[in-house]
Amino acid sequence: DKDVPVSVWPEWELIEKIGEGSFGKVYKAKRTERGRSFYSAIKIISIPASKGELDSVRSEMNNEQSTREYFRNLVEDCIQEIYTMEHFCGNSHVVSFEDFKVVEYLDEIGWDISIRMEYLTSFMDYCTGKELTEKEVIKLGCDLAMALIYCRKLNIIHRDVKPENIFVSRFGDFKLGDFGIAREQAHTMSNMSKKGTYSYMAPEIYKGEKYDSSIDTVSYTHLRAH
């Protein structure tokens, strides 16, 4: 597939694109060892996202160095997601982080950030053509509650709890993922930004007011109501 790039890990072959959003594209990847196949999900975030974005920033900056620094700061922001995911290693209620690589372009301003994670089924795909059983609904609520409890222990606010950011393991466990806009609470209390999805967003966010980890509880409540 011409739309599937080459993996930065030679042993992992990108098979197909399985997701795309404002925080990058996600691919299913396969590694073959001793006749057995293993799978991972690899998210690739390109900064800048397009030549148009690069040209737009260039037109506003005084020089090439300022343009490079602007995008380098965005790279550091994205690496924040990786640091956030590392906090959750070993937690069964959050998507497991496995590895990452940052590759800087040689001929132009730009970076590709590859994040390798466990391969799971998206909640939206899991629900396609079926209704959740009462047992599954209860388990979904309990698993997400445990994920948010752990977030609170680490002073991390997810800020975008919604169906698209929930995943399901082959054992039927529900996991919270995509910490692309998550931040450690201590770093965001004095300078909060409006990020999240309006359908599940706490009023404090879209009103531009200060908020704390309770906003994830509000999103969780909205999610259960749906």
Name each model-derived stretch.
Residues 25:
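Conserved N-lobe ATP-binding subsite of Hanks-type protein kinase domains
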Residues 221-226:
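Conserved small/polar residues in nucleotide/adenosyl-binding loops
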Residues 192-204:
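Conserved activation segment of eukaryotic-like protein kinases, specifically the C-terminal portion
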Residues 152-168:
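Catalytic-loop of the protein kinase fold
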Residues 108-123:
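Conserved short submotifs of the Hanks-type protein kinase catalytic core
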Residues 96-110:
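Short beta-strand micro-motifs within the conserved protein kinase catalytic domain, predominantly
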